[in-house]
Amino acid sequence: MATSSSAWLIFSDHYPEILIAIACFLIFSLLLSARSSSEDSLPYNWPIFGMLPAIISNSQFNDFTTARLRKMGWTFIFKGPWLLDMDYIFTCDPSNINHMFNDNFENYPKGELGKVFDIFGNNIFNADGDLWHDHRKMAQTILWDGNYRTMQATFIRNKMDNALIPILDSAASKRKPVDLQDVFFRFTFDTSCFSVLAADPESLTMEFPAVPFSKAADQALDAALTRHITPRLIWKLKRFFNVGSERTLAVAWKVIDSYIYDKIAELKAKRKLVGKINSYDAVSFYMDNFNIHDDKFLRDNAFTYLLAQRNTQSLTMAWLFYALFENPKVELKILSELKSIVDESSERRFNDGFALFDSNMIQSAIYLHATLCEALRIYPPVPFEIKDAHKADVLPSGHKVRAGEKILFSPYAMARMKGIWGDDCLEFKPERWITGNGTLKHEPAYKFFAFSAGPRICLGKELSFTQMKMVVATIIYNFHLQMVKGHVVEQSNSILMDMKHGLMVQVRKRSVM
């Protein structure tokens, strides 16, 4: 035995390249096998590696997961590498989601997963228990305040008038393609900064300037995804040694903090100079209504508000237009509805020949609202979320959950299940959201999960719908957009469902008045 060991050591010392080649061959074979596994079967559960190679080797995580969930009856056990605490329960079963977010809500807190998103700090996103309840009450006061909503609507209208329409008009005149996803990212970044920090960064201009904050925020979310698929010990070691994705996160964190803290300081300096001002941005609201002036508290909540508004609205609108490119009859129905609204409205808002839709005009846009719902159903901005169990539990599907075990649930997959949304689940069909009486149809939040469900359901849901309808209506009524021929739309493998290559479009003015 000793002789055999000595021979192995001599071999490894003199021929390391052969050992490396063997290791590479084994890894390549393992990945190739994982990639070639049938969509009708679970990922192969390898010794040591578990099912992780199948995930790593697949470029479309959401579609990969959907296929397995469809085959396995909406729930299956994902086995991670040995000894690394990476086993998950994957599910898209509405009864399981209702159980976690409603019936047994207290057993599925943010808990350890809050540490994955530590860049958000100690706010409504990461908080649990009494602290979360306090955060939610304050957020509700802000988001439901009439002055706050009026300020938001006015700024959005002005931003459409002074930035969005001129940029699209210029693109039409010059016949120059524009990345619509980037336009929406910039638009919502400007509007969210104003609503949160009373500042307009003016990122949506003809020059399309670099936006360090937005880039840093995207990098931070990518790092969070890396943490999700990396053993906790590994990403904590990477953070300790400041390498890889953790180094990227640290740099991005500094950019984010610098921007938000600077804006908070500017707002405080202005208030000190002129006294209390009638500003209804979120940060001013915390200071005026709740007497909270702590910079760290204000920073944490500002960052959450900024990302919530910027990402969800921009991605929803981008995917909506992509769906319209694939379903032009839907666009014609929206246009017909908008023409009727303009004809009947006593508040026609035109500027240089362009119609602007305000929050009052779009209240009766039922078909447009249904189209947004359908876009959110098929293309949820957050395609999957993760929970972990505080105590052992049994899901309605019959699957046992260990204390501390993680559950990944997929709204993206849920939208693609015939047993949940019907045989036409893959069709983009706004009509599914309209009743026989012509009113909007309600679906339970655990089935239509775009705004979360249960006690944590999004407080800004209706406000978000109103803002998106204003923007989408204004674009569709004034312009006809077409996707650039040959442009490929592909999902990024990310926590958010953004378009990897953007959404390049040609713009043409529309004559509808």
UniProtKB/Swiss-Prot annotation:
The keyword Oxidoreductase applies. One of its GO terms (molecular function) is monooxygenase activity. It is an enzyme of class 1 (oxidoreductase). The chain crosses the membrane at residues 14-34. InterPro entries: Cyt_P450, Cyt_P450_CS, Cyt_P450_E_grp-I, Cyt_P450_sf. Its EC number is 1.14.19.50. The keyword Translocase does not apply. Keywords: Alkaloid metabolism, Heme, Iron, Membrane, Metal-binding, Monooxygenase, Oxidoreductase, Transmembrane, Transmembrane helix. It catalyses: 4'-O-methylnorbelladine + reduced [NADPH--hemoprotein reductase] + O2 = (10bR,4aS)-noroxomaritidine + oxidized [NADPH--hemoprotein reductase] + 2 H2O + H(+); 4'-O-methylnorbelladine + reduced [NADPH--hemoprotein reductase] + O2 = (10bS,4aR)-noroxomaritidine + oxidized [NADPH--hemoprotein reductase] + 2 H2O + H(+). GO terms for cellular component: membrane. It comes from the Eukaryota. Cytochrome P450 that catalyzes an intramolecular para-para' C-C phenol coupling of 4'-O-methylnorbelladine in alkaloids biosynthesis, including haemanthamine- and crinamine-type alkaloids, promising anticancer agents. Catalyzes the formation of (10bR,4aS)-noroxomaritidine and (10bS,4aR)-noroxomaritidine from 4'-O-methylnorbelladine. This is Noroxomaritidine synthase 3.
